[in-house]
Regions:
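Post-cleavage N-terminal segment of exported redox proteins
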Residues: 17-117, 171, 204-214
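Extracytoplasmic electron-transfer domains, predominantly the class I c-type cytochrome c fold
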Residues: 34-35, 39, 47, 102-106, ...
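Generic anion/oxyanion-binding catalytic loop in active/binding sites
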Residues: 95-96, 120, 187-190
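Secretory-pathway/luminal and periplasmic proteins that interact with or process carbohydrate-rich
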Residues: 117-120, 140-144, 211
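Local sequence-structure signature of Cys/Sec-based thiol-disulfide redox active-site neighborhoods
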Residues: 119-130
């Protein structure tokens, strides 16, 4: 039988490495789990090669990723979840000019785009957020994922308030502040999206004129 070790990379992706032994999460002891994780990490680092903008530092984990990898496939203890959320909440930064809402039409384009950070992508061009891969947003788009909750009528359901706009900004900037070990990328914290792009995605969610709220 093979043992599967799950490692969350710096880019937020989950990598699964197979090693000899049983199932990682289950009856295995904590020291054995750590040893397997260390072997898997070493194997990943030795097998990956830098290619363009996809450099090896993407395999380096921060504290949040390390903890999420450690508890992958197991219930996350409440104290650990609170520790992760508190640490990530502290990373959130609001724009200096205080403007949180941009252009929802640009936000729709960003939500549709999955480009960015792959070795074959042009690093000089802005990345997309690929929101539709996990969420329903505009009803006009029939192809969407269901890993995340539906965001259709996000603003209408929550209210077109400053509180809703601030929450949307924070959630996009760093989702781990609200849901420890979320699969959602930390778009602001990891510099995937610019402040201007985050404004536009916020607008897609909270602008009454956006198709999301029609």
């Amino acid at each position: 039988m093979q043992r599967r070790t799950i490692v969350r990379t710096a880019s937020g992706a989950l990598l699964i490495a197979a090693t000899a032994g049983g199932v990682l999460y289950g009856c295995a002891s904590a020291p054995a789990d750590r040893a397997d994780g260390q072997r898997a990490e070493a194997m990943l680092k030795s097998s990956f090669k830098a290619h363009g903008q996809a450099t090896l530092d993407r395999l380096d984990q921060d504290e949040t990723q390390r903890l999420c990898s450690e508890y992958a496939g197991r219930a996350l203890p409440q104290p650990v979840a609170e520790r992760i959320e508190k640490a990530n909440l502290a990373t959130i930064r609001f724009p200096a000019d205080g403007k949180l809402v941009g252009d929802w039409k640009s936000g729709e384009k960003i939500a549709q785009s999955g480009r960015g950070f792959q070795y074959s992508d042009d690093p000089t061009k802005p990345a997309g957020a690929n929101c539709y891969a996990c969420h329903q947003l505009s009803p006009q788009e029939l192809s969407y994922g269901t890993i995340g909750p539906s965001l259709y009528q996000f603003g209408k359901r929550r209210g077109f308030t400053d509180e809703t706009r601030r929450y949307a900004w924070q959630k996009i900037y760093n989702a781990q502040a609200f849901n420890a070990c979320s699969n959602m990328p930390r778009f602001g914290h990891r510099h995937i999206l610019t402040d201007a792009q985050i404004r536009d995605v916020v607008a897609l969610l909270v602008d009454p004129a956006s198709p999301v709220n029609r």
